[in-house]
């Protein structure tokens, strides 16, 4: 008899939906388990078989936890803002809201076909105004806050205003002004100062501009779009930024609070990129008209300062125009133009040939003022990282070495060691050639020399010890229509203010007919003339709304909180419910989000923690990345390769339980695995064997016998209970399924069908293959759904083996084995071994020189 999967799966999916089987009792007194998938972007292509891998894993664990007595929160929603829907609208004229809704409907249909136990009453979409009302609310809180470096936390901007009123900028790393001066500043002057502290601010910066997309890209997004074939160039624009760098230390330090894959922790650490060293000013040889006294650089190797032979400034550094001599102006401007067309990714490519141009100007080495240092520009230095300038020590830095060799610049060793065709950058050797009338560090090691240089620079007030981060502030504006409107208004007076919170959500203008970027660097919202105009409710002043929208990452920064309380119209989440359910106990999703979504959401969560609206420092306690599922050709699934497998086709032919079981049986969850249609067929055959185990005869009637199980049958059962019960929480789904298969293989040949044993087996199968399990449970006479049943507990008495297997070696080579009582004595074990037929034949006529016995495991007979 073949398992009628289509009929069974259709029935139970409808049953679960109608009975709301998986709705969370959010105020339950049971222990909680919050199990979350990274919600998908609903693309037009729909799901492929790679998507259900992570969803199935979390579903198995969610079902298991319910059976273990937990109240489980397992929701699903849609990260639905983004470029693809808008680009489709530009091509077809169909509004992004329409295509997004259609895509969501298709994704939901596909996900429901898999039989996943989501609480659909909590479904959300980042494009829903009722949702992004609170995305905008969080944005306003960020805008109205600053990061207090003394307390290392965010505070209301009002506390900063009060501070300025009381003591000016004292005790802050900022240009000095007194309390009296603050009070005399105009509103615009005050706002300019406050914007230097706000967690959301505007800045004129070189951005990653994609002409084809008509928008800027965050640093973290560039590689993805270049890989898709888009050209990304650097272009100066005024953009909204989020001051994520203020949280760099906490983002790094608090990684110790989470249980995440070591590779992801390492990626975040590297992206944040903490380094300690010296920030020091190299004075100009000739004073500039602007009065600037020199160029600041940051170095992690103060001990090599005597080895500086040139300086490199980023081509886009504002100082370049001032320091370029008339003779070098044309070359410098040509180089600036060429470098502006390159992305940061291109510029940081280590293997590319070094290029650059001399500016014609010099600085002096502060540690050795008689040493003139030529100033060059080169695109391997980025203005957005550090100070935008470096001291070049070619003897002890590989990139500097390659640049110096290219342009014939001096290479001066100041650390003991041999320079061949690579720079020598040891931290274990001592300093040489490092002495002047200012200071000497000759003979000192790295640590001592660095400390001495830093102390000297601080005493001279030309430098200071500093901690620096590779992390840069988050470019938060996009020149697109399909994103959350930024709830700010710009007024002719020069002031920018958020709209009142009572007016949230600020919705997108629905009747916009043109979705293409304006071509001026503004978003299509600039074309919505009526929507643009805003009258300040307090002053009556007419302002213009901000036309940029938020990036796709905004909505995903906090969605895990909204699932807890999705219908609350007043708060993004009830405080008591947040305290009960946070943090997320398990978060599953792709490793590609390690330095995007995961970093951004941690940043927002820490801010929300600072302002007292969440109770945990980290949002996700445990994180797992599922491995990619490749095509059958072992290449990444892609339309262009024609190797995409649609789950609809698999479910239509083999059923959802087959898809679920196979994806979990392919191998460890985190591994990359190729798809195999033959593998699905094998799992489908297994489910049919399970079905036949419970059915018998030509009439295919259901059969379970009210008979006492044998001891052997109970041993098989309880061994399976223990194995499956241990493997599920450890995500060892493949070995758990293997044990279920062993169980079926043990029982299939027998004509016995003990109800106690086989009913328990159904409970073990349920998290993996819920449709067939529900059907078998119902047919065995149970009226309630499996979702309310308890997971079986293994009985220790059936896990104890009464016999042990002992192997027999002769001269160290395996010759035979036998079973013996667990408490067999050494003498009896050796006697049994000697009397085995194989062993007797080998020993015939030989002398046993030694008998070695490893209790309960091994006997080795040494013969001569």
From Swiss-Prot:
* Principal subcellular localisation of the protein: cytoplasm
GO MF terms held by the record:
aminoacyl-tRNA deacylase activity; ATP binding; leucine-tRNA ligase activity
Keywords assigned: Aminoacyl-tRNA synthetase, ATP-binding, Cytoplasm, Ligase, Nucleotide-binding, Protein biosynthesis
Q: Tell me, which GO biological process terms does this entry list?
A: leucyl-tRNA aminoacylation
Q: Family per UniProt?
A: Belongs to the class-I aminoacyl-tRNA synthetase family.
Any Pfam family from its record, for instance, is tRNA-synt_1
Motif window: 'KMSKS' region: 636-640
Q: Which reaction does it catalyse?
A: tRNA(Leu) + L-leucine + ATP = L-leucyl-tRNA(Leu) + AMP + diphosphate
Q: Please name the PANTHER family in this protein's record.
A: LEUCINE--TRNA LIGASE, MITOCHONDRIAL (PTHR43740:SF2), LEUCYL-TRNA SYNTHETASE (PTHR43740)
Q: Which HAMAP family match?
A: Leu_tRNA_synth_B (MF_00049_B)
**Alphabetical list of InterPro entries matching this protein:** aa-tRNA-synth_I_CS, aa-tRNA-synth_Ia, Leu-tRNA-ligase, Leu_tRNA-synth_edit, M/V/L/I-tRNA-synth_anticd-bd, Rossmann-like_a/b/a_fold, tRNAsynth_Ia_anticodon-bd, Val/Leu/Ile-tRNA-synth_edit
User: Does the entry feature the keyword Transport, yes or no?
Assistant: no
One GO cellular-component annotation of the UniProt record comes to: cytosol
The Enzyme Commission number assigned here is: 6.1.1.4
Q: Which domain of life is it from?
A: Bacteria
Q: Where in the cell is it found?
A: Cytoplasm
Q: Which positions carry the signal peptide feature in this UniProt record? A: none
Residues that bind ATP: 639
Q: Upper lineage ranks?
A: Bacteria, Pseudomonadati, Spirochaetota, Spirochaetia, Leptospirales
The name this protein carries in UniProt is Leucine--tRNA ligase
Renumbered ranges of motif 'HIGH' region: 40-51
């Amino acid at each position: 008899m073949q398992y009628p999967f289509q009929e069974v799966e259709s029935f139970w999916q409808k049953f679960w939906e109608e009975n709301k089987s998986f709705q969370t009792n959010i105020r339950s007194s049971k222990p909680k388990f919050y199990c979350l998938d990274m919600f998908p972007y609903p693309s037009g292509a729909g799901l492929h078989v790679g998507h259900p891998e992570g969803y199935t894993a979390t579903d198995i664990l969610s079902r298991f936890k319910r059976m273990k007595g937990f109240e489980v929160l397992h929701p699903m929603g849609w990260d639905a803002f983004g470029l693809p829907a808008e680009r489709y609208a530009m091509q077809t004229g169909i509004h992004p809201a329409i295509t997004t809704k259609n895509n969501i409907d298709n994704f939901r249909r596909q996900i429901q076909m898999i039989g996943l136990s989501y609480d659909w009453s909590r479904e959300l979409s980042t494009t829903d105004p009722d949702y992004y009302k609170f995305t905008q609310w969080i944005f306003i809180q960020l805008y109205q806050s600053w990061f207090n470096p003394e307390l290392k936390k965010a505070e209301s901007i009002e506390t900063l205003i009060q501070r300025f009123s009381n003591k000016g900028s004292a005790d802050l790393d900022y240009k000095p002004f007194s309390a009296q001066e603050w009070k005399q500043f105009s509103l615009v002057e005050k706002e300019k100062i406050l914007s230097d502290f706000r967690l959301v601010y505007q800045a004129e910066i070189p951005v990653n501009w994609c002409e084809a997309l008509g928008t800027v890209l965050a640093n973290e997004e560039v590689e993805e779009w270049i890989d898709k074939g888009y050209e990304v160039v650097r272009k100066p624009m005024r953009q909204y930024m989020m001051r994520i760098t203020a949280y760099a230390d906490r983002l790094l330090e608090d990684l110790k609070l989470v249980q995440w894959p070591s590779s992801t922790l390492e990626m975040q650490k590297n992206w944040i990129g903490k380094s300690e060293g010296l920030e020091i000013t190299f004075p100009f040889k000739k004073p500039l008209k602007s009065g600037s006294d020199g160029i600041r650089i940051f170095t992690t190797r103060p001990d090599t300062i005597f080895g500086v032979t040139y300086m490199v400034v980023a081509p886009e550094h504002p100082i370049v125009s001032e320091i370029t001599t008339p003779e070098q102006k044309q070359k410098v401007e040509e180089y600036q133009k060429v470098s502006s067309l390159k992305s940061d990714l291109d510029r940081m490519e280590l293997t590319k040939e070094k290029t650059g141009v001399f500016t014609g100007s010099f600085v002096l080495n502060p540690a050795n003022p008689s040493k003139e240092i030529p100033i060059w520009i080169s695109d391997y230095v980025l203005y957005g990282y550090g100070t935008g300038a470096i001291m070049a020590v070619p003897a002890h830095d590989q990139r500097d070495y390659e640049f110096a060799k290219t342009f014939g610049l001096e290479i001066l060793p100041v650390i003991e060691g041999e320079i061949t065709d690579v720079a020598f950058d040891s931290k274990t050797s001592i300093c040489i050639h490092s002495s002047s009338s200012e200071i000497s560090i000759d003979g000192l090691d790295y640590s001592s020399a660095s400390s001495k240089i830093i102390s000297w620079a601080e005493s001279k007030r030309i430098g200071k010890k500093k901690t620096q981060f590779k992390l840069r502030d988050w470019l938060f504006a996009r020149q697109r229509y399909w994103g959350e409107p930024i709830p700010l208004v710009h007024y002719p007076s020069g002031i920018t203010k958020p709209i009142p919170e009572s007016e949230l959500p600020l919705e997108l203008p629905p009747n916009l007919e043109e979705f293409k970027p304006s071509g001026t660097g503004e978003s299509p919202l600039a074309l919505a003339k009526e929507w643009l105009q805003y009258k300040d409710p307090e002053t009556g002043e007419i302002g213009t709304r901000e036309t940029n929208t938020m990036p796709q990452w905004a909505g995903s920064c906090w969605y895990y909180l909204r699932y807890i309380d999705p219908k609350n119209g007043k708060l993004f989440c009830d405080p008591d419910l947040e305290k009960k359910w946070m943090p997320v106990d398990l978060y599953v999703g792709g490793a590609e989000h390690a330095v995007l979504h995961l970093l951004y959401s941690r940043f927002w969560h820490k801010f929300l923690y600072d302002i007292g609206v969440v109770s945990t420092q980290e949002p996700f306690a445990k994180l797992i990345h599922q491995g990619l599922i490749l095509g059958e050709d072992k290449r990444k699934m892609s339309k262009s390769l024609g190797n995409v497998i649609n789950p609809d086709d698999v479910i239509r032919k083999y059923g959802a339980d087959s898809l679920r079981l196979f994806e979990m049986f392919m191998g460890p969850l985190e591994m990359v695995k190729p798809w195999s249609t033959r593998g699905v067929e094998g799992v489908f055959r297994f489910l049919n064997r399970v079905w036949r185990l419970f059915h018998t005869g030509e009439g295919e009637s259901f059969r379970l016998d009210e008979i006492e199980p044998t001891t052997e049958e109970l041993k098989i059962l309880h061994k399976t209970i223990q194995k499956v019960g241990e493997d599920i929480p450890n995500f060892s789904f493949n070995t758990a399924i293997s044990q279920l298969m062993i169980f079926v293989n043990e029982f299939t040949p027998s004509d016995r069908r003990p109800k106690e044993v086989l009913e328990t087996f159904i409970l073990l199968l349920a998290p993996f293959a819920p449709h067939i399990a529900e059907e078998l449970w119902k047919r065995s006479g149970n009226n309630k759904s499996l979702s309310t049943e308890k997971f079986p507990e293994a009985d220790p008495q059936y896990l104890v083996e009464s016999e042990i297997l002992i192997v027999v070696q002769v001269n160290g080579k395996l010759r035979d084995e036998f079973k013996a009582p667990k408490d067999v004595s050494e003498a009896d074990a050796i006697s049994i071994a000697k009397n085995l037929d194989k062993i007797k034949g080998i020993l015939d006529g030989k002398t046993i020189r030694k008998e070695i016995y490893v209790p309960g495991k091994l006997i080795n007979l040494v013969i001569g």
